[in-house]
């Protein structure tokens, strides 16, 4: 059987590396190409056409590593969101602690899927890029990043205790 007739390896390798990283008490992260069609991620956290997503069990809910896409729920800046990433957009999986993992090589099946999805999106009028899960909306738009340090509490002199009888 010709290699082009086989199903893509990426979903199987992704699941294997994910389990291996967890078995070794490491934190799995996905590198995603946000420029490909069908990617639903919080674009405000993307840099240079990519986003890195923590997919550790403590960071996400309802994680599905399916054969066609990765789906999960997560909070970004306190806002619950649903993330969906086609496997063609998954570039790598690695451990935050030591970089162990792999980059995925291009596969012909994903090149065909991407061209089909580009054609479909060109004919679509309107598509939601990112949706809020439970209707929560931020009260204000701020430019904070998840890696920023938390704000320092105000300094107001000595703390005071009082006796309550």
UniProtKB/Swiss-Prot annotation:
GO molecular function: ATPase binding; molecular adaptor activity; protein homodimerization activity; RNA binding
Induction summary: By amino acid starvation.
Gene3D superfamilies, per database record: SspB-like (2.30.30.220)
InterPro entries documented for this protein: SspB (IPR007481), SspB-like_sf (IPR036760)
Protein known as: Stringent starvation protein B
Function: Enhances recognition of ssrA-tagged proteins by the ClpX-ClpP protease; the ssrA degradation tag (AANDENYALAA) is added trans-translationally to proteins that are stalled on the ribosome, freeing the ribosome and targeting stalled peptides for degradation. SspB activates the ATPase activity of ClpX. Seems to act in concert with SspA in the regulation of several proteins during exponential and stationary-phase growth. Also stimulates degradation of the N-terminus of RseA (residues 1-108, alone or in complex with sigma-E) by ClpX-ClpP in a non-ssrA-mediated fashion.
Species annotation: Escherichia coli (strain K12)
Compositionally biased spans, kind Basic and acidic residues: 134-143
PANTHER family (UniProt xref): STRINGENT STARVATION PROTEIN B (PTHR37486:SF1)
One of the protein's GO biological processes: positive regulation of proteolysis involved in protein catabolic process
Segments for region (Disordered): 119-165
Signal peptide bounds: none
Keywords: Stress response
Gene: sspB
């Amino acid at each position: 059987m010709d290699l082009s007739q086989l199903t893509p390896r990426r979903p199987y390798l992704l699941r294997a590396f994910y389990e291996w990283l967890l078995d070794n008490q490491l934190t799995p992260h996905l590198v995603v190409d946000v420029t490909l069609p069908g990617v639903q991620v919080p674009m405000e956290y993307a840099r240079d056409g990519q986003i890195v997503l923590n997919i550790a069990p403590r960071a996400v809910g309802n994680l599905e590593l399916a054969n066609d896409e990765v789906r999960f729920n997560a909070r970004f800046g306190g806002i619950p969101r649903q993330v969906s990433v086609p496997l063609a957009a998954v570039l790598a999986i690695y451990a935050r602690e030591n970089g162990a993992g792999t980059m995925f090589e291009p596969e012909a099946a994903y090149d065909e899927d991407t061209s089909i999805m580009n054609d479909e999106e060109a004919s679509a009028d309107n598509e939601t890029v990112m949706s809020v899960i439970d209707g929560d909306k931020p009260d204000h738009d701020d430019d904070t990043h998840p890696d920023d340090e938390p704000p320092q509490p105000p300094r107001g002199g000595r703390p005071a205790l009082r006796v309550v009888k």
